[in-house]
Amino acid sequence: MTLTALLALLLSYLIGAIPAAAWLARARGVDIRKVGSGNSGATNVLRSLGKGPALLVASFDILKGVLAVLLARALGLSAEWAALCGVLAVIGHNFSPFLAFRGGKGVATSFGVIAILDPVLGLTTFVLAIACMWLTRFVSAGSIMGAFIAGALVLVLPRPTWDRAAVLFLAALLVWQHRENIRKLQAGTERRLGEKVS
């Protein structure tokens, strides 16, 4: 591992670790970790603060994934390192040192990584995940479905090994991060899209 690659990995992790949801909520006098699901992500911001702040958070979180991959490319690193930098950004988002190694579930940041690695795969996953979300009215269901779609497509499409490994890892991590949502979906207690924090 070269010093450049090590620096890129570290910076990617730190970029991903920027807790946009928590900091934006704090600026509005809300501790996002103590309201709603306690998750530091766009969905909890939507329920706690509304559409505008949620859109800002989602956009920033997507950008984190994109920037990590672009950083690796700008430093002249190979495609393998670019994919790994994307993965590190998602890990940083999910386990941020700024939030005692807690964070979000990595949906938006994973989408940013996948979209920049493979725009067609990213767009296809996004459209189908959004469709699932609107049909079921569950953000978590759309996110989980998106993970399965991305994982399935990357296995059947001719993709480089490193891109395939990165997407499969991110898909598995996303499903794992939603394990509590899966239990709530099974129990019928998961909040639907549009429900506010009580």
Curated annotation (Swiss-Prot):
Pathway: Lipid metabolism; phospholipid metabolism. Its EC number is 2.3.1.275. The keyword Flavoprotein does not apply. GO terms for cellular component: plasma membrane. GO terms for molecular function: acyl-phosphate glycerol-3-phosphate acyltransferase activity. It is an enzyme of class 2 (transferase). It catalyses: an acyl phosphate + sn-glycerol 3-phosphate = a 1-acyl-sn-glycero-3-phosphate + phosphate. SMART domains: G3P_acyltransf. Its main location: membrane. Belongs to the PlsY family. This is Glycerol-3-phosphate acyltransferase 1. It comes from Deinococcus radiodurans (strain ATCC 13939 / DSM 20539 / JCM 16871 / CCUG 27074 / LMG 4051 / NBRC 15346 / NCIMB 9279 / VKM B-1422 / R1). The gene is plsY1.
